[in-house]
Amino acid sequence: IDDIIKGEKIEQKKFFSKSFASTSFLMDDKLSNLDQFKDILSKFINTDKQEIIKSLLDSNLTGRGGAGFPAGMKWDFCRKTKSEKKYVICNADEGDSGAFSDRYLLEDQPLKVLFGMIICGYVIGSDEGVLYIRGEYPKSIEAINGAINSLKEEGLLGENILGTSFSFDLNI
């Protein structure tokens, strides 16, 4: 750095060819099709809600928005809040210029986005989720609509999901 500041020529001989990140921000393929979705969803909606929150808290999972707020705490606060109607909101506005993480998730991982919303709805006691997707992302809207329709056709979204008393619907 000192050489750069002085304006001297720098001989660059070292290149890093591997990542030193402690975690991967890319999602795995465990929810890439409807059969996997159904199996995992069935396990979750037959699990005690407090156990799911404890697992979230223990995992230290945080949101992708940059604030680093623990997801388990957020879900626990929502679950304990008394309200006649609760909503799960996915704000995929992506207001930061040059940011495409929301678009990537919506277009390439729509089942994972919807899975998170459905499980959140189960845990906090909500029967409705709303996604805000900016109009400049028509492919994102198309991908999410397609995933919503597929889930409804398979009985994985809507009334009495997988034969349980849990109902959840999604709107864009």
Task: List the model feature ranges, each with a label.
Residues 1-172:
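Feature of Fe-S/electron-transfer and energy-metabolism proteins
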